[in-house]
A protein has these predicted regions:
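Thiol-based oxidoreductase modules, predominantly thioredoxin-like and allied folds used
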Residues: 7-8, 27-42
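Generic alpha-helical secondary structure signal
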Residues: 19, 39-43, 73
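Ligand-binding grooves and catalytic loops that recognize ribose/phosphate and carbohydrate rings
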Residues: 42-43, 48, 68
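Structural micro-motif
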Residues: 46-57
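Non-catalytic, surface beta->alpha helical segment in thiol-disulfide oxidoreductase systems
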Residues: 57-77
Length: 77
């Protein structure tokens, strides 16, 4: 089974959502990407359709935007 990818920016809202996602779907089923520290993954997230973080991209390619922490434009600086 392919993993979901959870993108976030490292803020407290995002880290809280990360813990909830891991609890809900299991650590083995999700790859966590902190865009704040892995800036080289911004283009990947945008290509997947992520407009803001935190967001979960499902194995089927659906983007679930969770709450609102920061826009991708904000993360680019």
């Amino acid at each position: 089974m392919e993993k979901s990818v959870f993108y976030h920016a490292g803020c407290s809202v995002c880290v809280s959502a990360e813990h909830d996602i891991i609890h809900l779907i299991g650590a083995n089923n999700v790859e966590v990407v902190n865009i704040g520290t892995e800036r080289n993954r911004i283009a990947e997230a945008e290509k997947a359709g992520v407009k803001s973080v935190p967001a979960l991209v499902t194995p089927g390619g659906h983007v679930l935007h969770i709450n609102f922490g920061a826009s991708m434009a904000d993360l680019k600086g």
